[in-house]
Amino acid sequence: MEFRIDSIDGNARACTIKTEHSEIKTPIFMPVGTAAAVKSLDAIDMMEILDAPIILGNTYHLYLRPGDEIISKLGGLHGFSGYKRSFLTDSGGFQAFSLGDNVKFTDEGIWFKSHIDGSKHFFSPEKVIDIEYNLNSDIMMVLDDLIALPNTKERIKKSIERTTEWAYRSLVHHVNRGKKNNLFAIIQGGTDFEFRRISAESLVSLEYKGYTFDGFAIGGLSVGEENQLMYDTIEATTPYMPKDKPRYLMGVGTPEDIIEAVERGVDMFDCVMPTRNARNGYLFTTFGTLRIKNAKYKLDESPIDPKCNCYTCRNFSRAYLNHLFKAKELTYFRLASIHNLHYYLNFVKEIREAILEGRFKEYKKEFYSLRAMNSLEI
């Protein structure tokens, strides 16, 4: 993987990441394709209509169904899905954490029961890497020990220690296997700034046979904490992350979350929000959120967002989307998802342009000003 910083404005960064499959201009939003597909969209939509340079797949879900070995036999995620650009795969730690009583964390790894059929499985750091090799993702996340917040200092400390040990085991396994995939470590520590520093410094210091991690992520946020506390935690963490490697904030979030994190030095983002909100009838616009089911759109011939040039806004009206949503037509999910993802992808492109031109603060001020014009659902 190649990485370069193109411009810095304050702490906001515009960078370029090159993998085997694509060039990624940051800040970047990565659509979530949990089961090797972004919900309601296919690879052509992602490449030709949305021009997304990278999407996510999920190790936990793909391991259980259809199985990572099957995907490997069918050409990895790129051959299997038809999406020929970059894939990042999560380790499955968050999904295991979400299983509640059906999961057990030990120093060796994670025992869990499948949400599909109740069968019992074990993820070690090494096994997760092997699964990700079968998926052949461009960027592989290591297994981490994610905990609920708030939590005790003892449990947060244990999470950091275990996450660091698992990261080192992952790095050793990766180097010894001699594969070319890129490996990212995940910083934990809850919302305790000192624990975040310890976690970041511990992970950054890890090396094996001269190899270190290709990038670093901030994990364990956006799990119920107040927004400002999340922003403060990010701000307390990024100074301890290498300047010459990508910085990824996992599972975040709203447009506001993204612009605040960019201001604090983050490069990469993912979240299910654009597609989930689309399916539920909430569409992102320059001025706020539009609830498409509202009766006032029944005869509205205007596009979702007059400032948007996405495929949906160029070709279809609010009235048509209102009808499709109420009729529960499957076409609605595709058109709405295209719009919301375009909004996110275009949003980070605009942020990048502002950074390159040295006007990030002005762009941020304008962003909030436009949303304040109609902060309620329109």
From Swiss-Prot:
EC class (word): transferase
EC code: 2.4.2.29
UniProt cross-references to InterPro entries, sorted A to Z: ArchSynthase1/Queuine_TRR, TGT, TGT-like_sf, tRNA_ribo_trans-like
Any GO BP: tRNA-guanine transglycosylation
UniProt keyword annotation of Metal-binding present: yes
Co-factor binding details: Binds 1 zinc ion per subunit.
Residues of the active site: 90 (proton acceptor), 270 (nucleophile)
Chain positions recorded as Zn(2+) binding sites: 308, 310, 313, 339
Cofactor: Zn(2+)
Protein transport as UniProt keyword: no
Record's keyword terms, sorted: Glycosyltransferase, Metal-binding, Queuosine biosynthesis, Transferase, tRNA processing, Zinc
Known pathway: tRNA modification; tRNA-queuosine biosynthesis
Catalytic reaction(s) noted: 7-aminomethyl-7-carbaguanine + guanosine(34) in tRNA = 7-aminomethyl-7-carbaguanosine(34) in tRNA + guanine
Binding site for substrate: 90-94, 144, 188, 220
Any one Gene Ontology molecular-function term assigned to this protein's record: metal ion binding
GO cellular component terms attached to this protein's record: cytosol
Chain spans, region RNA binding: 251-257, 275-279
Quaternary state and interactors: Homodimer. Within each dimer, one monomer is responsible for RNA recognition and catalysis, while the other monomer binds to the replacement base PreQ1.
NCBIfam families from the UniProt entry: Q_tRNA_tgt (TIGR00430), tgt_general (TIGR00449)
Family recorded in the similarity comment: Belongs to the queuine tRNA-ribosyltransferase family.
PANTHER family hit by this protein: QUEUINE TRNA-RIBOSYLTRANSFERASE
Protein's job: Catalyzes the base-exchange of a guanine (G) residue with the queuine precursor 7-aminomethyl-7-deazaguanine (PreQ1) at position 34 (anticodon wobble position) in tRNAs with GU(N) anticodons (tRNA-Asp, -Asn, -His and -Tyr). Catalysis occurs through a double-displacement mechanism. The nucleophile active site attacks the C1' of nucleotide 34 to detach the guanine base from the RNA, forming a covalent enzyme-RNA intermediate. The proton acceptor active site deprotonates the incoming PreQ1, allowing a nucleophilic attack on the C1' of the ribose to form the product.
Protein name as annotated: Queuine tRNA-ribosyltransferase
Taxonomic lineage of the native organism: Bacteria, Pseudomonadati, Campylobacterota, Epsilonproteobacteria, Nautiliales
